[in-house]
Amino acid sequence: MDYIQITKDNIEKEHICCAMSGKQSVMKKEWLKQRFAEGLVFYRSTERGKCFIEYIPAENAWVPIQADGYVYIDCLWVSGSLKGHGYANELLQQCVQDAKGQGRKGLCILSAEGRKREFLSDPKFMAYKGFAVADTSECGINLMYLPFEQDAEPPKFKACAKHPAVEQSGFVLYYTDQCPFTYYWVPRVEEAAREHGIPLKAVHITSK
């Protein structure tokens, strides 16, 4: 498989394989443009389809973790006819090489306890690749890591994510432009909440 790196120089002419609709693509690309200077890397296959990896120095990740010195994987996704050919291994190896070249402590990524959940990494695959659980939130989200040295301090969740809670009744949904699927799901979650009389506040995070 051949891969291409999306950069500030080619992002206008290249498609983002996780964002195929107009609004999804525009907002995702704008978010990426602002992150390239912070060290974000986006590799995708040259073939059409969802086969890509996106990662960034953990200090600049838009997730509530403490993982200085690590590289955080925003998304590793291979789907459809591209599954089962070892492409996820190739993309992950590219990330490992980049992280080691930068002198990083290791990699980290979010998954869920016990099973694969939508929009989170597969814990069984990550464990097979050498990742271990560094921390777990009360809502069952795991922070997994792959240290490059045995004495590397494990990353951890910040307190707000370790013990998530809101003061008001109902639910608060926080989302960013990092994942383009929020433009599909957030309105549908809001609609479902209205239909069932569930208090819901959606918060669009636009800065770290």
List each language-model region with its residue ranges:
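Short amphipathic alpha-helix that is part of the acyltransferase structural core
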Residues: 1-48, 181, 185-189
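Conserved beta-strand in the GNAT
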Residues: 44, 48-60, 72, 77
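A conserved beta-turn-beta hairpin within the catalytic core of GNAT-like acetyltransferases
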Residues: 60-73, 83
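Conserved acetyl-CoA-binding loop-helix of GNAT-fold acetyltransferases
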Residues: 78, 84-99
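Conserved GNAT acetyl-CoA-binding A-motif
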Residues: 99-115
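Conserved catalytic-core motifs of GNAT/GCN5-like acyltransferases
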Residues: 110, 127-144
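C-terminal "cap" of GNAT-fold acetyltransferases
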Residues: 138-163
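Local sequence-structure signature of Cys/Sec-based thiol-disulfide redox active-site neighborhoods
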Residues: 160-195
